[in-house]
Structure formats: C-alpha cells, structure tokens
From Swiss-Prot:
Residues 29-39 have a biased composition (Low complexity). Keywords: Cytoplasm, DNA damage, mRNA processing, Nucleus, Phosphoprotein, Transcription, Ubl conjugation. One of its GO terms (cellular component) is nucleolus. Ubiquitinated. Ubiquitination leads to degradation by the 26S proteasome pathway. The modification Phosphothreonine is found at T35. It is found in: Nucleus, Nucleolus; Cytoplasm. Present with 2640 molecules/cell in log phase SD medium. It comes from Saccharomyces cerevisiae (strain ATCC 204508 / S288c). This is CTD kinase subunit gamma. GO terms for biological process: DNA damage response; mRNA 3'-end processing; positive regulation of DNA-templated transcription, elongation; positive regulation of transcription by RNA polymerase I; positive regulation of transcription by RNA polymerase II; positive regulation of translational fidelity. CTDK-I consists of three subunits, CTK1, CTK2 and CTK3 (also called alpha, beta and gamma). Interacts with CTK1. Heterodimerization with CTK2 is required to protect this subunit from degradation. Gamma subunit of the CTDK-I complex, which hyperphosphorylates the C-terminal heptapeptide repeat domain (CTD) of the largest RNA polymerase II subunit. CTDK-I phosphorylates 'Ser-5' if the CTD substrate is not phosphorylated at 'Ser-5', but will phosphorylate 'Ser-2' of a CTD substrate if 'Ser-5' is already phosphorylated. CTDK-I is also more reactive toward substrates that are prephosphorylated at 'Ser-2' or 'Ser-5' compared with an unphosphorylated CTD substrate, therefore efficiently creating doubly phosphorylated CTD repeats. The keyword Metal-binding does not apply.
C-alpha cells in the first residue's frame, strides 16, 4: 500500500468511526489460536486494527490525515476521533518498553500531539463543543493512569463562586514552544481545566438574578443534522459500552491467562481434597443442560 492509498483508506476509517469504533481493547499481538472467519471479518473492519497493521510504514501519513480530516468535521463529531486516538495509544503503550519503533511513534508523534487532538475536540470560542468536556476528561484520566502521569488537578471541580473570564480561551497552540510529550500532557491538563471553567461560566448565567444574557456566552445555532448525528453517536457509544461491560482484559487473546489458571488451580488444590461423586453428578447435569440447549 503506497502513501496515497494509505491516506485514502484512513480517511474512510475516520469518516466511519461512528459505525466501526467498538468499545474493545485489541492487542497488538495476535493469539496463537486460529481466528474464526466471523471474528476475522470484525478485525478487518476494526479501525484500531487497521492502524496497528499499517502504522509502521504510514504513521506520518495517518497523523497528518487525521488532523486534516478532523478539522473539516463539526466539533460535535470530533469526539470519536479523540476516543480512537486514545485507544491507539492504549494498544501501543504496553509494547513501547520492548520495541524502539513503537516508542518513537508514541513519544515523538502520538503523545507529542495529544494536546492538539484534545483541542480539536474542545476548540476556542465554541460553546457547544463543551458537550465533549466530560468524556474528554475521562479519556485523559484513563490515559494518564496508563502512562503514569499525575493528572489529579483535572479531577478538581471549580467552585460555583469562582470569578471566570468568559472572553479569554486557553489555546495549546500558543504554548507549544518546546517539543516534549510530557509538556504536551501538561498543556492538555491546562486545556481541560480551562474548559471546565468555561462550562461553569455558561451555566452560571442561568443561576444568576440578571435577566440579560452575556453576549460572550451566546451560542450559534447548530444544524439539526449535526445534532441528530451526535445523538446517534452517543446512543451507539452507550450501547457498545453495555454490550461489552462483561469484558475482561487479558494479556493476550487466549481464553484464560496462564497466571489466572494457576491461581484457580492452586486454590482448589489447597481448599478442596478433590472431586467427589456429587461434583461429577453436577458436571453431568450441566453437560446435559448444555446439550439440550442445542437441540434445534
């Protein structure tokens, strides 16, 4: 796949994130077992797997394409891109300690521009984009926990009595004087704290006794199709989270982790003398129930 083809395919991946971005955690290492055809089809359509399969040769193309394509979206539609971006980092980070190529892509590309990605979702002077604030905070805190970055200040909720300047919006672009991913994380932290204050300022006007609305806090009308698209995206995200709430993260795609199996095996060896007749009867009963469920 050449550079042009990679860009074209990645644009389609970004445009279809609402339909294809599942709430799963895919490992960069494949299982030793054979993947069933149905599962293979899902992996082929998975946007995270697409990135993991092709990023070694095209990560620069993908990165530039992500910003160019996302800039053309409405801010309400950009949340899926941030979710996608963070999940890519989550999949790559466990391998960064043993693979220098992964470390380079993470530290010099993905984490380096994490602040710009979040600002795409929370742009300056766009009040409706504050709808993305809560999810962005969750994503950043989740990412900070993964890479061991202290982001406790983001969890602090500003007081209702705080005096807020609604006219000045923090922008990470004016602060990008050095190239260091740790400073990029700090700028993202500052961005989220500023947007928390802007969100508070927006709601404070409805709690005040003044009848006049501050012109700096007025929002522009939003296209109905954009609102409906965002509502559908939120519904789909909620649906996916419910469908996979039972999911247990494994170090690999194997059914049972080796350490987990040993722990269970040792537990039964030390607390139970072994199987008795009742155990075998229970197993037979469960087997009969399982067979009966496949009669048709």
């Amino acid at each position: 796949m050449d550079s042009l083809e990679a860009r074209l395919q990645f644009i389609q991946v970004l445009k279809n994130l609402q339909k294809t971005l599942h709430k799963t955690r895919d490992s960069i290492t494949s299982s030793s077992t054979t993947t069933p055809p149905s599962s293979q089809q899902k992996l082929n359509n998975d946007p995270i797997q697409f990135y993991l399969r092709n990023y070694r040769h095209h990560y620069e193309d993908f990165h530039q394409c992500l910003f160019d394509t996302t800039m053309k979206m409405d801010p309400l539609d950009r949340l899926d891109v941030v979710i996608y971006y963070v999940r890519i980092i989550r999949n790559l980070y466990p391998h960064s300690h043993s693979n220098t190529n992964v470390t380079k892509v993470l530290n010099e590309v993905l984490l380096m521009d994490i602040d710009l990605v979040f600002e795409l979702c929370l742009p300056c002077q766009d009040w409706k984009s504050l709808t993305n604030q809560a999810t962005c905070k969750e994503l950043f805190l989740d990412l900070s926990k993964l890479i061991h970055y202290d982001a406790t200040s983001v969890t602090h909720t500003p007081s209702d009595t705080t005096l807020i300047d609604a006219t000045t919006w923090y922008s990470v672009k004016t602060e990008r004087t050095t190239k260091d991913y740790k400073e990029s994380l700090q700028r993202t932290e500052s961005l989220l704290k500023d947007r928390d204050l802007k969100k508070l300022a927006f709601f404070q006007q409805f709690n005040s006794d003044t009848t006049a609305i501050n012109p700096d806090l007025q929002t522009q009308p939003t296209n109905a199709n954009i609102l409906l698209h965002r509502m559908e995206a939120d519904r789909e995200l909620h649906k996916r989270s419910k469908e996979t709430s039972w999911y247990i993260e494994r170090p690999s795609n194997d059914i049972l982790d080796e350490s987990e199996f040993k722990s269970l095996w040792t537990h039964f060896e030390t607390t139970d003398s072994g199987f008795d007749k009742d155990d075998y009867k229970n197993i037979k009963a469960l087997n009969d129930i399982a067979k009966a469920s496949y009669i048709y």
